[in-house]
A protein has these predicted regions:
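N-terminal Rossmann NAD(P)H-binding glycine-rich loop of SDR-like oxidoreductase domains
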Residues: 21-39
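SDR active-site strand-loop-helix element
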Residues: 24, 48, 80, 123-129, ...
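Short-chain dehydrogenase/reductase
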Residues: 99-103, 143-158, 180
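Anionic-ligand binding region
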Residues: 183-191
């Protein structure tokens, strides 16, 4: 909720003009629920398509490039792209896929936003609570990165937002833990 506060501020600050939000990973568990919620609040939602050159907002996995429709001013961009970390065994190739799928699209998106003639005010990018590694101590969001695979993945994923941050776009990392939902994810596996 705290990370979405800037979106609420955007909405409150401009009732006269509809705010446009781009979401990567909009078809995923979190992205689909967030899209519905934000649309209900009055935001115009745009999806970052994958490998669809006809789309207004497209990510080419071959060239690792994001194309943006600059005729639409985006107030915010929310990056939720990447396959579920809970699906499948963590083989060496799966770990590489999880890393590349997150870092590549985040880098491409942050680079495209930084180069936009009128960049968004806000870039929210998914990350993972695994950033902190394993610890029995209470941690705050100011705690440094821990050790291990998830911490390394999250650190590199967050670093990929650098081009947007350096361009002056307010950037926040959403360090998700286990997502529980009756619509998918790990909950069904636990029941």
């Amino acid at each position: 909720a705290r990370a979405l506060a800037p979106l609420n501020e955007l909405m409150q600050g401009s009732k006269a003009m509809q705010q446009h939000v781009l979401i990567s990973g909009a078809s995923g568990l979190i992205g689909s629920a967030l899209s519905t919620h934000l649309a209900g609040l009055g935001f115009a939602i745009h999806r970052l398509e994958r490998d669809n050159s006809a789309a207004r907002f497209n990510y080419s996995s071959a060239s690792k490039h994001v194309s943006l429709d600059h005729s639409i001013f985006l107030s915010a961009v929310i990056n939720l792209a990447g396959p579920s970390i809970a699906d499948g065994r963590w083989t060496a190739s799966r770990k590489q896929e999880l890393l590349e799928s997150r870092v590549d699209i985040t880098t491409a998106l942050a680079t495209a936003l930084a180069a936009a003639p009128k960049p968004p005010a806000l870039f929210l990018s998914a990350s993972a609570v695994g950033f902190y590694g394993e610890s029995t101590l209470p941690l705050s969001e100011e705690a440094p990165a821990g050790g291990g695979y998830l911490a390394s993945l999250a650190t590199r994923w967050e670093a990929a937002t650098g081009p947007a941050r350096r361009a002056g776009i307010a950037t926040a990392h959403l360090r998700f833990g286990v997502v529980l939902s009756t619509k998918g994810g790990v909950l069904g596996k636990l029941m």
